[in-house]
Every structure is written in structure tokens, then in C-alpha cells.
Amino acid sequence: MMIGKYYRNREERCISGGTGCGVVYLSGCDMHCAYCLVYEISQKGAGTPATPRQLADLLLSLQERGVSHISLANVEPSAGEVVEAITIARERGLALPLLNNFNGYAPAALTRRLLPYFQGYVMDFKYADAALGERLSAAPAYPARAVENLALLSSHYGPNRYAENGLLQSGVLLRHLILPGAWQNTEEALRLLAKHNPCGYPLSLLPDFVPEGNTAAVLSPPYTVPAGRLRQLQALAAELGISLL
């Protein structure tokens, strides 16, 4: 297992509060997004070797820094070691909610295995267009897998539960990166979510495209969705009954 980087960050308010969210990126990924924001970590394996006990130490140190939640990204390639680390950390006093920052693409059996160790998921819902998923992420089965995984999360967590201060106690947040020029993918992703989100999990629409991967293969240089287009997509989400963060 390799730890790519870790830090305190401002995420969605319900997982950051006033103290921030602890974010840990593990190295490796089961997708190959050409535009990945952490391309060196996810695709090239950059990072520092770590044992489960060392990852447990890191989780406890983030708790000591006062974060409200801890989000672990790229869990699936190191699933066994992550489970061991979480078990050690819980035995040593880790009390914070743990979130799996999840790309949505893992096989269902692996998702089932990991669910009991996390209080929630922050799940990407990247593609409704399977061909686009294949071209940009080498993930042609993405829409079907994402829908299957969302069903598993919905069954396991049920509707989101929040503390009195508005912080997420258990449940799921969804994210969708709006890819430049691929507006139809976003529109269809919203329609697909509307059909397969029985618990009404809220969605963050992400308008800032900042590729750091194989720039020859991505859709565009760094780009922010025009305000008018973003309003159209937000209006479609509202029309479909999707709650936006």
C-alpha cells in the first residue's frame, strides 16, 4: 500500500463543518481517467509505502487535528490493507466518520466487502455515456457499474442522517464533474441518477475542469463551465428532483 498524499481540506459543508475534512489519497486506481486531478498518484503510483499500522497512525493523527470527517480515496486497490488499518485505528480510539471517496466503478462484491467499514461514501457518478467512459477512463462498463453500486449504497445506508449541526453521520454524497463539450453526458447522467437514487442523495455538480493527466487525450485545457450552461444543468437537476449541494 502507498499513501500518495494527505491534507485537511474544505469539502462539502456537511463533511467539513468549520474544521475541515481530512483527505487521504492512496496510490493506484481501478480507472484510468486521462484528466485525473491526482494523475501521478492514481496512474503512476507515486507515494510513500505504508503498512496498515502506519495508515492507522495517520487516521488517528488527522482526528487529533480536529477534522470533522476523514475521506479515503482510491481504497479499492488496497482494500485488504485499508480494512486492517481501519480496524486497528478503531481499536485505538478512532471515532470520526470515515468516508470512502469512491469513483463508482468497483465490482459489486468489493463494494459489499468495504461498506461495513465506512460511515458514508462520497461517490462520483461520472458517465452515462459508456463510450465516453471507455475513451476517457478505459471504463466502458461505467454506467452499469455505477448504477449497481449506487443501489448497494442505498440499500446499506438508507436516507442520509445528519447531526444537529448539519454534519453527515451516515449516508452518501454524489459528485459529477461536468466535462467540457460533453453536456449530453451530464444531462443523461442526471436523468440516470433521477431513476436510480431512491434515497434522494444530494449531488455536487462540479464545473471546474483542471486536467493534470495525459493532456493529449483530454477534452480541453483547464476550463470552467460557462455560467449560463451551469444554470441550465442546475435547472434540469431541479426539474428531475435532484437535490444539489
Ranges and model annotations:
Residues 85-95, 148-153, 230-233:
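Alpha-helix-loop-beta-strand connector modules within alpha/beta enzyme cores
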Residues 22, 70, 98-100, 121-123, ...:
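Hydrophobic faces of well-ordered beta-strands that scaffold small-molecule active sites
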Residues 158-245:
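Auxiliary Fe-S-binding modules of radical SAM enzymes
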